[in-house]
Amino acid sequence: MGLIIDTSIIIALERGKVSTKQWSHYGQAYISPIVLTELLIGVDRVNNENKRIKCLAFIEYVKSLFTILPFGIEEVYTYARIINDLYKQRITIGTHDMLIAATAITHGYSLLTLNVKDFKRIQGLEVLTVSSKD
């Protein structure tokens, strides 16, 4: 059994609001390269150099903690299906979320997120969540 970790969980992990222990019972945890992209976009938006260095160090930690799954041709086909399914239902979801979902569906893994509302609308995706310390 495997689990894809969404960006919302990674950000909560960085902020100390969740712990890897909360999902360790699901087995191997992975991230999509899109999650890494979102994290790097966030780093590029940081103006404070010290904070930027901390963010980059955290990204290196994330890369060591999780296997980054590939995004290849199978994921592309799944992504296209997701777009078409949502279009037929007149549902709009962020591009990155659909790409992350495509990675999870293609590999047959559940998705762990704090953004349940959007991901629940994607057919064929098992969505899981954990409680976050606020």
Curated annotation (Swiss-Prot):
Positions binding Mg(2+) in this chain are: 6, 97
Q: What is the lineage of its organism?
A: Bacteria, Pseudomonadati, Pseudomonadota, Alphaproteobacteria, Rickettsiales
What does the sequence similarity comment in the record state about its family?
Answer: Belongs to the PINc/VapC protein family.
- Cofactor(s) annotated in UniProt: Mg(2+)
Q: List keywords of the entry alphabetically.
A: Hydrolase, Magnesium, Metal-binding, Nuclease, Toxin-antitoxin system
Official protein name in the record: Ribonuclease VapC1
What Pfam families does this protein's entry cite?
PIN
Residues forming the PINc domain are: 4-123
Cystine links in this protein are none
Q: Name one GO molecular function term.
A: magnesium ion binding
Q: What is its EC number?
A: 3.1.-.-
Q: What domain of life does the native source organism fall in?
A: Bacteria
Q: Which InterPro entries match?
A: PIN-like_dom_sf, PIN_dom, Type_II_TA_system_RNase, VapC_family
* HAMAP family with a match to the protein in the record: VapC_Nob1
| Purpose | Toxic component of a type II toxin-antitoxin (TA) system. Has ssRNase activity. Upon expression in E.coli inhibits growth in liquid culture; this toxic effect is neutralized by coexpression with cognate antitoxin VapB1. Its RNase activity is partially inhibited in vitro by VapB1.
